[in-house]
Protein backbone atom coordinates (compact mmCIF):
# COMPACT_ATOMS: atom_id res chain seq x y z
CA UNK A 1 0.00 0.00 0.00
CA UNK A 2 1.22 3.49 -0.82
CA UNK A 3 2.44 5.11 2.38
CA UNK A 4 1.04 8.47 1.28
CA UNK A 5 -2.26 7.48 -0.34
CA UNK A 6 -3.35 5.55 2.73
CA UNK A 7 -3.76 8.82 4.62
CA UNK A 8 -6.19 10.19 2.00
CA UNK A 9 -8.43 7.24 1.19
CA UNK A 10 -9.63 4.26 3.17
CA UNK A 11 -7.55 1.18 2.45
CA UNK A 12 -8.22 -2.20 4.02
CA UNK A 13 -5.90 -2.61 6.98
CA UNK A 14 -5.19 1.12 7.32
CA UNK A 15 -8.66 2.42 8.21
CA UNK A 16 -7.47 3.94 11.48
CA UNK A 17 -4.92 6.14 9.69
CA UNK A 18 -7.21 8.02 7.29
CA UNK A 19 -6.68 11.75 7.77
CA UNK A 20 -3.50 11.46 9.83
CA UNK A 21 -0.53 13.70 8.97
CA UNK A 22 1.73 12.19 6.36
CA UNK A 23 5.16 10.89 7.34
CA UNK A 24 8.04 10.89 4.89
CA UNK A 25 9.81 7.54 4.66
CA UNK A 26 12.69 8.80 2.53
CA UNK A 27 15.82 8.55 4.60
CA UNK A 28 18.34 10.46 2.47
CA UNK A 29 16.46 13.27 0.75
CA UNK A 30 18.24 16.62 0.64
CA UNK A 31 16.35 19.77 1.49
CA UNK A 32 15.27 22.08 -1.31
CA UNK A 33 17.68 24.67 -0.01
CA UNK A 34 20.65 22.32 -0.40
CA UNK A 35 23.26 22.96 -3.04
CA UNK A 36 22.13 20.57 -5.75
CA UNK A 37 25.42 21.00 -7.59
CA UNK A 38 27.32 19.60 -4.64
CA UNK A 39 27.84 15.86 -5.12
CA UNK A 40 26.61 13.54 -2.41
CA UNK A 41 30.12 12.21 -1.93
CA UNK A 42 31.30 15.53 -0.51
CA UNK A 43 28.55 15.65 2.09
CA UNK A 44 29.16 14.22 5.57
CA UNK A 45 27.95 10.66 6.18
CA UNK A 46 24.67 10.46 8.02
CA UNK A 47 24.86 6.82 9.05
CA UNK A 48 27.77 5.11 10.76
CA UNK A 49 28.04 1.37 11.45
CA UNK A 50 27.09 0.20 14.92
CA UNK A 51 30.09 0.47 17.24
CA UNK A 52 29.76 -1.67 20.39
CA UNK A 53 31.42 -0.89 23.71
CA UNK A 54 34.78 -2.72 24.01
CA UNK A 55 33.38 -5.08 26.65
CA UNK A 56 30.36 -5.83 24.46
CA UNK A 57 32.65 -6.39 21.48
CA UNK A 58 34.76 -8.85 23.49
CA UNK A 59 31.60 -10.69 24.59
CA UNK A 60 30.50 -11.13 21.00
CA UNK A 61 33.98 -12.27 19.96
CA UNK A 62 33.71 -15.03 22.57
CA UNK A 63 30.18 -15.87 21.43
CA UNK A 64 31.24 -16.04 17.77
CA UNK A 65 34.02 -18.49 18.67
CA UNK A 66 31.98 -20.40 21.26
CA UNK A 67 30.08 -22.67 18.89
CA UNK A 68 29.72 -23.63 15.24
CA UNK A 69 27.45 -21.04 13.62
CA UNK A 70 27.61 -22.41 10.07
CA UNK A 71 24.27 -24.30 10.31
CA UNK A 72 22.42 -21.01 10.86
CA UNK A 73 21.43 -18.63 8.03
CA UNK A 74 23.74 -15.64 7.77
CA UNK A 75 20.93 -13.09 8.11
CA UNK A 76 19.92 -14.56 11.50
CA UNK A 77 23.34 -14.46 13.15
CA UNK A 78 23.12 -10.97 14.64
CA UNK A 79 19.85 -11.83 16.38
CA UNK A 80 20.92 -15.30 17.48
CA UNK A 81 24.22 -14.13 18.93
CA UNK A 82 22.48 -11.33 20.80
CA UNK A 83 20.10 -13.90 22.29
CA UNK A 84 23.09 -15.90 23.51
CA UNK A 85 24.53 -12.70 24.98
CA UNK A 86 21.23 -11.94 26.72
CA UNK A 87 20.58 -15.42 28.08
CA UNK A 88 24.16 -16.50 28.75
CA UNK A 89 23.25 -19.81 27.14
CA UNK A 90 24.50 -21.07 23.77
CA UNK A 91 21.59 -23.53 23.63
CA UNK A 92 19.05 -20.70 23.67
CA UNK A 93 19.20 -20.48 19.87
CA UNK A 94 18.38 -24.14 19.26
CA UNK A 95 14.64 -23.65 19.72
CA UNK A 96 14.33 -20.41 17.74
CA UNK A 97 11.97 -20.19 14.78
CA UNK A 98 12.11 -17.62 11.96
CA UNK A 99 9.44 -17.64 9.28
CA UNK A 100 10.87 -17.29 5.75
CA UNK A 101 12.01 -13.72 5.15
CA UNK A 102 11.21 -12.61 8.70
CA UNK A 103 14.54 -10.83 9.26
CA UNK A 104 14.37 -8.91 5.99
CA UNK A 105 10.72 -8.02 6.64
CA UNK A 106 11.62 -6.75 10.11
CA UNK A 107 14.49 -4.59 8.88
CA UNK A 108 12.40 -3.08 6.09
CA UNK A 109 9.53 -2.44 8.51
CA UNK A 110 11.73 -0.65 11.03
CA UNK A 111 13.09 1.62 8.31
CA UNK A 112 9.70 2.30 6.71
CA UNK A 113 7.10 2.19 9.49
CA UNK A 114 9.42 3.33 12.30
CA UNK A 115 7.18 2.07 15.08
CA UNK A 116 7.48 -0.76 17.60
CA UNK A 117 4.54 -2.01 19.68
CA UNK A 118 5.42 -3.91 22.87
CA UNK A 119 3.29 -5.83 25.34
CA UNK A 120 5.10 -4.54 28.45
CA UNK A 121 7.36 -1.62 29.28
CA UNK A 122 10.26 -3.95 30.11
CA UNK A 123 10.58 -4.81 26.41
CA UNK A 124 10.39 -1.11 25.61
CA UNK A 125 13.15 -0.19 28.06
CA UNK A 126 15.35 -3.03 26.78
CA UNK A 127 15.62 -1.42 23.36
CA UNK A 128 18.87 0.44 22.66
CA UNK A 129 18.00 4.12 22.91
CA UNK A 130 20.87 5.25 20.68
CA UNK A 131 19.70 2.99 17.85
CA UNK A 132 16.09 4.14 18.18
CA UNK A 133 17.20 7.76 17.93
CA UNK A 134 19.63 7.13 15.06
CA UNK A 135 16.94 5.40 13.00
CA UNK A 136 14.08 7.66 14.13
CA UNK A 137 11.97 4.80 15.50
CA UNK A 138 9.12 5.34 17.98
CA UNK A 139 7.98 2.79 20.55
CA UNK A 140 4.56 2.43 22.15
CA UNK A 141 3.30 0.35 25.07
CA UNK A 142 -0.18 0.95 26.45
CA UNK A 143 -0.23 -1.60 29.25
CA UNK A 144 -0.34 1.05 32.00
CA UNK A 145 -2.71 3.50 30.26
CA UNK A 146 -6.11 4.16 31.80
CA UNK A 147 -7.80 3.38 28.46
CA UNK A 148 -6.11 -0.02 28.44
CA UNK A 149 -7.26 -0.73 31.99
CA UNK A 150 -10.86 0.16 31.08
CA UNK A 151 -10.74 -2.02 27.96
CA UNK A 152 -9.35 -4.89 30.02
CA UNK A 153 -12.24 -4.65 32.47
CA UNK A 154 -14.88 -4.19 29.78
CA UNK A 155 -13.87 -7.21 27.69
CA UNK A 156 -12.48 -9.43 30.43
CA UNK A 157 -8.98 -9.67 28.95
CA UNK A 158 -5.55 -9.02 30.42
CA UNK A 159 -4.04 -5.56 30.21
CA UNK A 160 -1.27 -6.90 27.98
CA UNK A 161 -3.86 -8.24 25.54
CA UNK A 162 -5.79 -4.97 25.72
CA UNK A 163 -2.59 -3.05 24.98
CA UNK A 164 -2.05 -5.10 21.84
CA UNK A 165 -5.66 -4.48 20.78
CA UNK A 166 -5.25 -0.74 21.31
CA UNK A 167 -2.04 -0.81 19.30
CA UNK A 168 -3.94 -2.44 16.43
CA UNK A 169 -6.61 0.26 16.65
CA UNK A 170 -4.07 3.10 16.78
CA UNK A 171 -1.46 2.02 14.24
CA UNK A 172 -3.03 -0.54 11.93
CA UNK A 173 -0.52 -2.56 9.93
CA UNK A 174 2.38 -0.11 10.14
CA UNK A 175 4.06 -1.64 13.17
CA UNK A 176 6.52 -4.25 14.41
CA UNK A 177 5.08 -6.16 17.39
CA UNK A 178 7.47 -7.39 20.09
CA UNK A 179 5.99 -9.55 22.87
CA UNK A 180 8.21 -10.76 25.70
CA UNK A 181 6.04 -11.21 28.77
CA UNK A 182 2.42 -12.21 28.26
CA UNK A 183 1.18 -15.27 26.34
CA UNK A 184 -2.23 -13.56 26.34
CA UNK A 185 -0.71 -10.80 24.20
CA UNK A 186 0.31 -13.38 21.60
CA UNK A 187 -3.16 -14.91 21.75
CA UNK A 188 -4.75 -11.52 21.13
CA UNK A 189 -2.35 -10.72 18.28
CA UNK A 190 -3.06 -14.00 16.48
CA UNK A 191 -6.81 -13.53 17.02
CA UNK A 192 -6.70 -10.08 15.44
CA UNK A 193 -4.62 -11.41 12.56
CA UNK A 194 -6.99 -14.28 11.80
CA UNK A 195 -10.35 -12.72 12.62
CA UNK A 196 -9.84 -9.05 11.75
CA UNK A 197 -7.25 -9.09 8.98
CA UNK A 198 -4.52 -7.38 10.99
CA UNK A 199 -1.21 -7.56 9.16
CA UNK A 200 1.63 -6.22 11.32
CA UNK A 201 4.93 -6.17 9.48
CA UNK A 202 6.52 -8.61 11.95
CA UNK A 203 5.43 -10.34 15.16
CA UNK A 204 8.10 -11.31 17.69
CA UNK A 205 6.68 -13.64 20.34
CA UNK A 206 9.08 -14.74 23.08
CA UNK A 207 7.28 -14.72 26.45
CA UNK A 208 8.61 -16.81 29.31
CA UNK A 209 6.52 -19.03 31.57
CA UNK A 210 4.57 -22.23 32.00
CA UNK A 211 0.90 -21.24 31.63
CA UNK A 212 -0.13 -21.02 28.00
CA UNK A 213 3.35 -20.13 26.80
CA UNK A 214 4.10 -23.23 24.72
CA UNK A 215 0.64 -23.23 23.17
CA UNK A 216 0.54 -19.56 22.16
CA UNK A 217 4.04 -19.71 20.67
CA UNK A 218 3.09 -22.76 18.64
CA UNK A 219 -0.07 -20.98 17.49
CA UNK A 220 2.01 -17.99 16.41
CA UNK A 221 4.40 -20.28 14.53
CA UNK A 222 1.42 -21.63 12.57
CA UNK A 223 0.06 -18.13 11.86
CA UNK A 224 1.05 -17.98 8.20
CA UNK A 225 -0.44 -14.57 7.46
CA UNK A 226 2.45 -12.53 8.90
CA UNK A 227 6.24 -12.73 9.27
CA UNK A 228 7.11 -13.99 12.75
CA UNK A 229 9.97 -14.85 15.07
CA UNK A 230 9.35 -17.09 18.08
CA UNK A 231 10.68 -20.22 19.79
CA UNK A 232 9.52 -23.51 21.22
CA UNK A 233 9.18 -24.18 24.91
CA UNK A 234 8.99 -22.10 28.06
CA UNK A 235 12.16 -20.03 27.74
CA UNK A 236 12.12 -16.39 26.70
CA UNK A 237 11.26 -13.12 28.36
CA UNK A 238 11.28 -9.39 27.80
CA UNK A 239 15.09 -9.19 27.40
CA UNK A 240 14.85 -11.81 24.66
CA UNK A 241 12.17 -9.90 22.76
CA UNK A 242 14.17 -6.68 23.11
CA UNK A 243 17.34 -8.42 21.91
CA UNK A 244 15.64 -9.51 18.70
CA UNK A 245 14.60 -5.93 17.94
CA UNK A 246 18.07 -4.64 18.84
CA UNK A 247 19.59 -7.14 16.42
CA UNK A 248 17.24 -5.98 13.68
CA UNK A 249 18.11 -2.34 14.35
CA UNK A 250 21.85 -3.07 14.27
CA UNK A 251 21.52 -4.83 10.92
CA UNK A 252 19.33 -2.00 9.62
CA UNK A 253 21.85 0.66 10.63
CA UNK A 254 24.81 -1.29 9.27
CA UNK A 255 22.95 -1.82 6.01
CA UNK A 256 22.23 1.88 5.65
CA UNK A 257 25.85 2.75 6.42
CA UNK A 258 27.14 0.24 3.87
CA UNK A 259 24.71 1.43 1.21
CA UNK A 260 25.65 5.04 1.82
CA UNK A 261 29.37 4.27 1.66
CA UNK A 262 28.86 2.37 -1.60
CA UNK A 263 26.91 5.24 -3.14
CA UNK A 264 29.54 7.76 -2.08
CA UNK A 265 32.32 5.59 -3.52
CA UNK A 266 30.41 5.32 -6.80
CA UNK A 267 29.94 9.09 -6.89
CA UNK A 268 33.64 9.64 -6.35
CA UNK A 269 34.57 7.09 -9.01
CA UNK A 270 32.24 8.78 -11.50
CA UNK A 271 33.85 12.19 -11.06
CA UNK A 272 36.18 13.03 -13.98
CA UNK A 273 39.83 13.02 -13.01
CA UNK A 274 41.53 16.40 -13.08
CA UNK A 275 43.79 16.76 -16.13
CA UNK A 276 46.99 18.73 -15.38
CA UNK A 277 47.56 21.68 -17.68
CA UNK A 278 50.90 22.15 -19.39
CA UNK A 279 52.48 25.54 -18.98
CA UNK A 280 53.00 27.27 -22.29
CA UNK A 281 56.01 29.56 -22.52
CA UNK A 282 55.10 33.09 -23.48
Regions found by a protein language model. Give the residues of each.
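Buried hydrophobic positions in well-ordered alpha/beta secondary-structure cores of metabolic enzymes
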Residues: 119, 204-205, 244
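Short glycine/serine/threonine-rich phosphate/pyrophosphate-binding segments
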Residues: 123-126, 183-189, 210-214, 237-241
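C-terminal functional extensions of proteins
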Residues: 211-263, 275-282
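Intrinsically disordered, low-complexity repeat/linker tracts enriched for polar/charged residues
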Residues: 10, 21-22, 260-268, 272, ...
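Electropositive, gly/pro-rich neighborhoods at or near active sites that engage anionic ligands
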Residues: 39-115
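Long, charge-dense
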Residues: 131-172
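Active-site cofactor/substrate anionic-group-binding motifs, chiefly glycine-
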Residues: 93, 99-145
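Cysteine-cluster motifs in flexible loop/terminal segments that predominantly coordinate metals
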Residues: 2-8
Amino acid sequence: NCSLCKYRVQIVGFEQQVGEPQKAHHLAVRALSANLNEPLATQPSRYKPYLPHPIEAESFRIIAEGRDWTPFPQDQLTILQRLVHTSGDFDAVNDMYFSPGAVDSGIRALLRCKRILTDVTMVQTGLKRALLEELGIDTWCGVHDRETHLMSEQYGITRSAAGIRRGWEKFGNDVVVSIGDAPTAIAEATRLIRDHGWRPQLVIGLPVGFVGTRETKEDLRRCLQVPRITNRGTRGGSPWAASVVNGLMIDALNGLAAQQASEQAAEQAAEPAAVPREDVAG
